[in-house]
Amino acid sequence: MSLRFYNTLSQQVEEFTPLHDNVVRMYTCGPTVYNYVHIGNLRTFTFQDILRRWLRARGYQLDHVMNITDVEDKIIRNAKAANQTIQEYTAIYTKAFLEDIATLRLERPERIVLATEHIADMVSAVQKLEERGFTYVSDGSVYYRISNFPSYGKLSHNDFSGIRAGARVDVDEYDKADARDFVLWKAQKDGEPGWDSPIGKGRPGWHIECSAMAMKYLGETLDIHTGGVDLTFPHHENEIAQSEAITGKPFVRYWLHAEHLSIDAQKMSKSAGNFYTLRDLLGMGYAPEAIRYLLASVPYRKKLSFAFDGLKAAATSIDRLRNYKLRLKTDKFPDGANTALSERTRAAASAFDAALDDDLNTAEALASVFEYIRDTNTAMDAGGFPAGNVPAALEFLNRFDSVFDVLKPATRTDGLADTEVNALIAERTAAKKARNFTRSDEIRAELAAQGVILEDTKEGVRWKRS
């Protein structure tokens, strides 16, 4: 079955084929580093991670660029309030973002690029738009004349034909009711940063940043552009208007947008004050892999309602997966192989692949895994799961985890948590019972390396921290 994605541009599920052989050129709108990202933001980046991993599992090579917006209105305000330069201020939250994605096991794109390191590229893009008649100047700032781009609105599927010519908007974020000519280059104001350029001293608008950086690294036409659904308009609409006005070619072939994460039926956002950061949840004792599981478990085009019960359920699901893998590694199975079980494993793997091929349907993919675990646990309980079927079962579980990446407990910089120590001790006990002394010794050594000393007694295993 072919790989298919819902394309926001066409509003249809389409078969995916990259423009050039098996290399996928992909761009992701990264964070605006004016504060810590919240888990609603991280839902989008988790979707992008699942997408990356599945494209690679399907044999594609990736050339993936993510930007970091490190100059814009909120950053300037917040840096001034903190009495810091924008470089000092954004360095804090850029570092925090990179730490957060590492904690959630999100793969880094091949390139992460900062807006302030590409000012010359943005100036060049604005100049090309000037040459082609898509701009005008007002009060020293350069604006994009959207009336000169007849297909404006084709991504968000809004009709902007009635917009009053010459009406302008200076802020980077606005809704469709305020759609107007948008700023490409903002003339410097007192107390704000600015860069000298042939188009005047100033700074780039948000939208030109992504157009310039995407085309610099990925060319005139991208295979995939991802982001949150809230970026469809105006940001991605404006990216199309800018880029296609410069090149005369389609900017992006497949637009993929992740839906909102909501809390109490409201979109989670900093402006509403109804958000949690990853650090908030870790501080409450939730494991990063449980947070990752929750964010990945609902298909990206469906809204995800955040609840702490959902995090607890995610942790329970991960325990079930880990216990199953432990059973496969430590139980003593009868000799031989079962043809029906071999076919059941192949069917489960096929269902898993088909679900992710179908616009990354993570819910169906997870269902295929847990149905398989249920069926094979039943066979194991009855003594009807031969040793010859174990390798294929482990291979299927590993394929699942190559995408979802939740089975390995998180490494803690302050040592293992008590629950993690107890889980490893339970695994060691099961390994010893199965006479797998090699694994038993490995676990003892692993715990010792983490400062945990074991003592085997008649009453069971005791442990202490060194």
Task: Describe every region a protein language model picked out.
Residues D63, G133-D139, I453-E455:
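Short, well-structured beta-strand/strand-turn elements
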Residues I68-D73, T94-F97, E107-M122, G140-F149:
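Short, glycine/charge-rich beta-strand/loop segments that flank catalytic centers
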Residues N274-S466:
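Structural preference for alpha-helix termini/caps and helix-kink/transition segments
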Residues S10-E15, L19-R105, E459-W463:
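N-terminal, positively charged nucleic-acid-binding surface of large information/translation enzymes
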Residues K80-I86, E110-T116, G228:
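The substrate-binding groove and active-site-proximal loops of carbohydrate-active enzymes
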Residues M1-Y34, F45, D49, E99, ...:
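Alpha-helical recognition segments enriched in aromatics with Gly/Pro capping
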